């Protein structure tokens, strides 16, 4: 009996093989089952032969998130930009790759591309205004969009809760025209078990039924409040720490008196009635204690009501993470950090404009404030001739350090005059001129020569060398 069964199995195997070999089209069009890349971890996704790629996509709020996507075999290169929205978090991601995420929580999102001409606000007696999307405007998926204000264009009054995101277990309510984050209504507590009706527990305890018996146990304690993020952040002078978007951010003070006043972590600079700045810890019972504003907004008490208003970020705030190549600087263009080519202002002097006499002229770097277009990147400097064969370009500062003549603090200028290191020799005028006469600093800064004689632009109020 066993031999017969074995023969039957062998016949079936050979039959299957012969059918497969007889039909090569079967192998040609056969495809493996689809991979479920979105369920893999990072290590599993990056594993060899996983058939998946681990790609980053950026949300409108600037959050980079990695997704495990199926490799289409073409390298997952760039594709026409599209948008997808997360149904769980409402985050909108800009999809740049031909390999798209396949998460069950993501769906295609249609970008609002209306124009004011299409809104026809004037026809109904209103005006068209461009507003920022909530909560963020960062990528091509979240541009500004037009709304009708006034008239009968359907704009209507804007809810004060429009730009307010409340913490967990809180919801925003419009109370007398103000946005308030109030606790969500909780379901009524369950009725006590009939076995607990005759049980009276002490303070801080409650009755439960365990193993068919009533007993008193300690009431669960509420979780501790989240840490105050700004307690661990020390902002520079003229900036206060404000928490929004779940992060601590240094924002520029509104009061000019606070520009040069420095406060420790967890404290804000405020100005009293005598216009004197001092450090004060934010009131924990303030109206904004339960209000979390979207990115780019900060909560302020206006008319005794908490309101989310757009807050100016520090200059070039998004540029802090963008490193531009040499000859380029970061500037904010259309709310996005961009690398632009640095241009030399027309007033900048070169060695052709300076007569150093018997001295050598070299262009030395100038410490320009970041983003300044009115500051000369390099300035001319008169130096003693080098005793070596090296030229000035061998030194990173643009001049040679080999100065053995003189006392190191002065430069001979002709037979009579001796100039200091921070001065230039003008033989035609028979005088020494401070190098800072040839440097034009940006507003809010002044020219000061450092210990090596190189002029630099320093912010006003900074102690010079």
Curated annotation (Swiss-Prot):
Domain of life from the UniProt record: Eukaryota
SMART domains from the UniProt entry: FOLN
Gene Ontology terms: biological process: sporulation resulting in formation of a cellular spore
GO terms under cellular component: spore wall
Keywords of the record: Repeat, Signal, Sporulation
Disulfide bond entries: none
Signal peptide: 1-22
Coiled-coil spans in chain: none
InterPro entries: Dict_spore_N (IPR007643), Fol_N (IPR003645)
Domain DSCP-N: 35-153
Presence of keyword Repeat: yes
Ranges of residues in domain Follistatin-like: 160-182, 195-217, 229-251, 257-280, 287-309, 318-340, 435-458
The keyword Cytoplasm is assigned to this record: no
Function: May contribute to the structure of the coat at the interface between the middle, cellulosic layer and the outer, electron-dense, proteinaceous layer.
Protein name in the entry: Probable spore coat protein DDB_G0283555
Species, as recorded: Dictyostelium discoideum
Lineage: Eukaryota, Amoebozoa, Evosea, Eumycetozoa, Dictyostelia
């Amino acid at each position: 009996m066993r031999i017969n069964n074995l023969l039957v199995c062998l016949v079936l195997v050979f039959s299957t093989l012969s059918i497969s070999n007889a039909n090569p089209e079967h192998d040609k069009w056969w495809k493996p089952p689809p991979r479920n890349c979105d369920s893999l971890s990072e290590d599993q996704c990056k594993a060899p032969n996983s058939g998946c790629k681990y790609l980053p996509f950026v949300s409108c709020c600037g959050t980079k998130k990695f997704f495990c996507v199926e490799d289409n075999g073409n390298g997952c290169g760039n594709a026409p930009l599209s948008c997808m929205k997360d149904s769980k978090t409402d985050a909108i991601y800009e999809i740049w790759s031909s390999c798209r995420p396949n998460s069950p929580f993501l769906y295609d999102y249609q970008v609002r591309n209306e124009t004011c001409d299409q809104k026809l606000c004037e026809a109904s007696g209103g005006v068209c205004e461009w507003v920022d999307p909530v909560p963020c405007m960062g990528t091509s998926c979240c541009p500004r969009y037009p709304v009708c204000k006034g008239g009968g264009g359907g704009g209507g009054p804007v809810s004060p809760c429009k730009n307010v995101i409340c913490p967990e277990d809180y919801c925003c309510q419009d109370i007398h025209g103000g946005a308030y984050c109030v606790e969500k209504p909780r379901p009524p507590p369950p009725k006590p078990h009939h076995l607990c009706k005759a049980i009276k527990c002490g303070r801080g305890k409650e009755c439960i039924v365990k193993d068919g018996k009533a007993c008193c146990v300690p009431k669960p304690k509420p979780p501790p409040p989240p840490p105050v993020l700004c307690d661990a952040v020390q902002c520079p002078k003229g900036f206060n720490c404000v928490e929004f978007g779940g992060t601590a951010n240094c924002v520029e003070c509104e009061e000019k008196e606070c520009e040069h006043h420095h406060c420790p972590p967890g404290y804000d600079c405020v100005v009293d009635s005598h216009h004197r700045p001092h450090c004060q810890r934010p009131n924990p019972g303030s109206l904004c204690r339960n209000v979390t504003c979207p990115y780019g907004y900060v909560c302020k008490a206006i008319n005794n009501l908490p309101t989310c208003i757009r807050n100016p970020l520090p200059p070039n705030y998004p540029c802090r993470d963008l490193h531009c190549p040499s000859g380029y600087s970061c500037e904010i263009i259309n709310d996005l950090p961009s690398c632009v080519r640095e241009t030399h202002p027309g007033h900048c002097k070169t060695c052709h404009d300076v007569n150093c006499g018997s001295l050598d002229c070299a262009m030395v770097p100038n410490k320009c404030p970041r983003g300044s277009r009115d500051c000369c990147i390099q300035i001319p400097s008169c130096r003693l001739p080098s005793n070596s064969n090296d030229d000035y370009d061998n030194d990173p500062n643009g001049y040679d350090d080999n100065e053995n003549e003189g006392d190191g603090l002065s430069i001979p200028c002709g037979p009579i005059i001796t100039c200091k290191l921070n001065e230039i020799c003008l033989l035609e005028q028979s005088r020494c001129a401070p190098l800072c006469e040839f440097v034009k600093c940006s507003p809010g800064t002044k020219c000061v020569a450092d210990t090596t004689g190189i002029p630099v632009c320093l912010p006003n109020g900074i102690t010079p060398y």
